[in-house]
């Protein structure tokens, strides 16, 4: 039974109350849904890339909702209650960061920047600091401290992993959720929809910016990422 449909995925119940099926759609959206398109095979590519990334992170001790891949478009995941926060890590200046602070794209930051936003389309996912999140009862201080440390750890793992594939991890967003025991674990997806990935040598963008900014065929970019991950 369909439980929820988001911009890029559908969530279905299973016979096990503690497990869901995630179905990856072909829909592409940008600018909080203002730009939309359906792009054939995008969902398949995101499912395959996310599967590889969740498996890679599991090898490094990062627990996520991922259980196993079921098909080209579907994965089985643990039931989690998603926290109403998106966490963002920036290694290189790009996107909204450049617009917000008036800096050039492509500056390598001295250290990663950790950001949080309130996961709410109605308000445009506004940025939050720790005090905002605590005051709005979106998370406790201890939970925010865990999110920060876990996200920065994930950043180091993914940076090294992508670098082996000649990809720069420019920035990315993650979502976390609480499992049935109340533990906070990584959720959602890890794909070129949620990560900015540039070629190390040419800085060619192989992520959703191809769609956002009309920089080339989106599927071609995602296929290139998957091909490198499968090497």
Regions found by a protein language model. Give the residues of each.
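A long amphipathic alpha-helix within ATP-dependent nucleotide-binding catalytic cores
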Residues: 138-170
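Conserved metal-phosphate-binding beta-hairpin within the catalytic cores
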Residues: 89, 169-188
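Active-site loop/lid in soluble adenylation, ligation, and acyl-transfer enzymes
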Residues: 2-118, 229
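Phosphate-binding core of ATP-grasp and ATP-grasp-like enzymes
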Residues: 107-124, 155-168, 191-196
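A short glycine-rich, hydrophobically flanked beta-strand micro-motif that places a catalytic Asp/Glu
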Residues: 68-73, 163-178
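Short coil-to-beta-strand
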Residues: 20-22, 120-131
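Short histidine-centered catalytic/ligand-binding loop motif
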Residues: 34-44, 127-150
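C-terminal helix-cap and adjacent tail motif
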Residues: 190-231
């Amino acid at each position: 039974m369909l439980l929820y449909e988001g911009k890029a995925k559908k969530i279905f119940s299973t016979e096990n109350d503690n497990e869901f099926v995630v179905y990856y759609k072909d829909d592409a959206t940008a600018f909080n849904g203002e730009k939309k398109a359906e792009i054939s095979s995008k969902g398949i590519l995101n499912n395959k890339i996310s599967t590889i990334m969740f498996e890679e992170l599991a090898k490094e001790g990062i627990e996520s909702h991922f259980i196993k891949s079921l098909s080209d478009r579907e994965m089985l995941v643990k039931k989690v209650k998603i926290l109403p926060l998106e966490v963002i890590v920036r290694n290189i200046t790009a996107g909204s960061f450049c617009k917000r602070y008036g800096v050039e794209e492509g500056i390598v930051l001295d250290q990663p920047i950790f950001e949080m936003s309130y996961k709410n389309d109605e308000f445009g996912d506004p940025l939050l600091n720790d005090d905002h999140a605590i005051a709005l009862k979106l998370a406790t201080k201890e939970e925010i401290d865990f999110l920060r440390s876990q996200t920065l750890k994930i950043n180091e793992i993914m940076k090294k992993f992508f670098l082996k594939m000649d990809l720069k991890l420019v920035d990315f967003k993650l979502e976390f959720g609480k499992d049935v025991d109340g533990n906070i674990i990584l959720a959602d997806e890890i794909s070129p929809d949620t990560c900015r990935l540039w070629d190390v040598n040419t800085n060619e963008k192989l992520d959703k910016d191809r769609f956002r900014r009309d920089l080339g065929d989106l599927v071609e970019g995602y296929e290139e990422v998957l091909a490198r991950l499968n090497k």
